[in-house]
Amino acid sequence: MKELLYLAAFLAVTLGIAHSVLGERYILVRLFRRDDLPKLFGGTEFTTRTLRFAWHITTVAWFGFGALLLHAGRGDLTPSGTLRIIGFTFILSGLLPLVITRGKHLSWLVLFAIGGIALWGAA
């Protein structure tokens, strides 16, 4: 079973990388060329930045799942360790809207709060 969990972890990370790279190259770029994107806050920049972080946040989540699967395969997945992985996954998820939308999409506040609470629970 250990090897299958390692394989699942590898597949989760690989899928995340493929999702971000291929999605950026073949979906997002083409989508952003459209003339009919919603104009929020005076233009389409907020819309494109929000769509970009929303796309890539899936990859961060899959990396977090990959870490959980890896630790499950190693047999050292504890409640505290699980909370640490969840906490760091949410902190990394919060960095996406903070950086990509320059803080305009306020989800980063909630994502950081969730991550902080999870890390606090792990301590």
Residue ranges and their predicted role:
Residues 9, 86, 108-115:
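Hydrophobic core segments of alpha-helical transmembrane domains in multi-pass membrane proteins
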Residues 3-25:
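N-terminal signal-anchor transmembrane alpha helix
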Residues 41-85:
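Alpha-helical transmembrane segments and their cytosolic membrane-interface
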Residues 76-77, 84, 91-108, 118-123:
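Membrane-helix boundary connector in multi-pass membrane proteins
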Residues 3, 17, 29-33, 72, ...:
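Polytopic alpha-helical membrane-helix bundles and their juxtamembrane interface segments
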Residues 25-50:
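Cytosolic, membrane-interface loops and tails of multi-pass inner-membrane proteins
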Residues 12-19, 62-69, 90-97, 115-121:
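Helical transmembrane-bundle signal
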Residues 1-9, 70-81, 121-123:
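Helix-coil boundary and interhelical linker segments in multi-pass alpha-helical membrane proteins
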